[in-house]
């Protein structure tokens, strides 16, 4: 088991930000949330960080590495860096509030 004091310091380094796209909002109906995470973190630390930050019960974590892509600015060619995406499935009664309520 991972020590909880570790997540006190580094949970924000593991979970970068949530993904808000059409596909990600469709996944919200199935109680699945998408996040961009640190590319070097594994499923166990992602699960523990989500449970610590949002106080929810995580059932499953699916991850995938997305490749770097070409980016052209004028005549110069560069690369957008690669990143890691995690799709987190929560238990039936839990919920993460991603959108601000007015």
From Swiss-Prot:
<protein>
    <recommendedName>
        <fullName>Large ribosomal subunit protein uL23c</fullName>
    </recommendedName>
</protein>
<keyword id="KW-0150">Chloroplast</keyword>
<dbReference type="GO" id="GO:0006412">
    <property type="term" value="P:translation"/>
</dbReference>
<keyword id="KW-0934">Plastid</keyword>
<dbReference type="GO" id="GO:0003735">
    <property type="term" value="F:structural constituent of ribosome"/>
</dbReference>
<dbReference type="Pfam" id="PF00276">
    <property type="entry name" value="Ribosomal_L23"/>
</dbReference>
<comment type="similarity">
    <text>Belongs to the universal ribosomal protein uL23 family.</text>
</comment>
<keyword id="KW-0689">Ribosomal protein</keyword>
<keyword id="KW-0694">RNA-binding</keyword>
<keyword id="KW-0699">rRNA-binding</keyword>
<dbReference type="InterPro" id="IPR001014">
    <property type="entry name" value="Ribosomal_uL23_CS"/>
</dbReference>
<dbReference type="GO" id="GO:1990904">
    <property type="term" value="C:ribonucleoprotein complex"/>
</dbReference>
<comment type="subunit">
    <text>Part of the 50S ribosomal subunit.</text>
</comment>
<keyword id="KW-0687">Ribonucleoprotein</keyword>
<comment type="function">
    <text>Binds to 23S rRNA.</text>
</comment>
<dbReference type="GO" id="GO:0019843">
    <property type="term" value="F:rRNA binding"/>
</dbReference>
<dbReference type="InterPro" id="IPR012678">
    <property type="entry name" value="Ribosomal_uL23/eL15/eS24_sf"/>
</dbReference>
<dbReference type="InterPro" id="IPR012677">
    <property type="entry name" value="Nucleotide-bd_a/b_plait_sf"/>
</dbReference>
<dbReference type="InterPro" id="IPR013025">
    <property type="entry name" value="Ribosomal_uL23-like"/>
</dbReference>
<dbReference type="GO" id="GO:0009507">
    <property type="term" value="C:chloroplast"/>
</dbReference>
<dbReference type="GO" id="GO:0005840">
    <property type="term" value="C:ribosome"/>
</dbReference>
């Amino acid at each position: 088991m991972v020590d909880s004091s570790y997540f006190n310091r580094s949970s924000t380094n593991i979970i970068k930000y949530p993904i808000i796209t059409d596909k990600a909002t469709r996944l919200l109906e199935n109680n699945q949330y998408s996040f961009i995470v640190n590319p070097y973190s594994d499923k166990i630390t992602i699960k523990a960080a989500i449970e610590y930050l949002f106080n929810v019960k995580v059932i499953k974590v699916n991850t995938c590495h997305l490749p770097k892509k070409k980016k052209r600015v004028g005549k110069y060619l560069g690369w957008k860096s690669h990143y890691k995406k995690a799709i987190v499935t929560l238990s039936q009664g839990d919920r993460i509030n991603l959108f601000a309520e007015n």
